[in-house]
């Protein structure tokens, strides 16, 4: 269990060389990167050191979408689109589609929690109920912007946006205590309620265990598995968990 994405933000007036070096360092983590960058030249330099890992370039808006589209298309990466409101987001997304780019994600983050929630729900509703394909892309919700510094609030909002249509959720940090309920919640969202939550029977090596490691066993009920495996991983002892 780990953070699957790393968001690397490029603030206004950031130094291109420093940002590129930070992106290169983040790429070494082996996680998918999301580059929050609105400057086409800086974005191009950053993508040069990480494009093979297929990052997301989150930086297109009404003022720069043509240049950002050219950068993203050349690198073959997903382009994130934002707008000052839903109308601008829609128009910019439609303009990118006319340029032939449908490899997009929508940044639905607003000025505050209320606006962000409304944006995210309305975008998904337009795609599903109104069959509007222009809003039929995954969404990014940046909790750092709407709850900066409040880690507990970010964790609470992450649970809400997991259920209410956030495809990529950006937080300042992810501790084990925050990750466990959030990952369990995400798993439940994509679980068939008519089927019991079970773990596939098999042998699960923990902490670098090999064939000579200690063997322990537990039942296949998913909640039990996650509780037991979490405790065993924290012990640091190499062992094989048999389900």
Question: Where is each model-derived feature located?
Answer:
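Conserved mixed alpha/beta catalytic, RNA-binding, or beta-rich assembly cores of soluble enzyme
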Residues: 1-94, 99-243
């Amino acid at each position: 269990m780990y953070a699957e994405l790393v968001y690397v933000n490029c603030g206004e007036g950031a130094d291109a060389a420093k940002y590129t070096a930070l992106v290169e360092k983040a790429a070494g983590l082996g996680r998918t990167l999301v580059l929050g960058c609105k400057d086409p030249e800086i974005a191009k330099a950053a993508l040069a050191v990480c494009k093979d890992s297929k990052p997301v370039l989150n930086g297109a808006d009404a003022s720069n979408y043509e240049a950002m589209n050219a950068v993203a298309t050349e690198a073959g990466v997903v382009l994130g689109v934002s707008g000052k409101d839903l109308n601008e987001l829609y128009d910019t997304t439609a303009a990118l589609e006319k340029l032939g780019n449908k490899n997009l994600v929508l940044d639905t983050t607003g000025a505050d929690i209320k606006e962000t929630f409304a944006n995210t729900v309305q975008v998904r509703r337009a795609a599903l109920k109104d069959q509007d394909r222009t809003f039929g892309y995954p969404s990014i919700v940046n909790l750092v912007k709407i709850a900066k510094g409040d880690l507990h609030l970010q964790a609470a909002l992450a649970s809400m946006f997991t259920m209410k249509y956030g495809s990529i959720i950006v937080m300042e940090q992810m501790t084990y205590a925050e990750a466990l309920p959030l990952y369990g919640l995400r798993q439940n969202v994509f679980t068939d309620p008519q089927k019991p939550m079970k773990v596939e029977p098999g042998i699960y090596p923990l902490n670098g265990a090999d064939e000579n490691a200690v063997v322990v066993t537990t039942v296949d009920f998913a909640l039990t598995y996650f509780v037991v495996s979490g405790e065993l991983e924290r012990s640091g002892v190499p062992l094989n968990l048999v389900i």
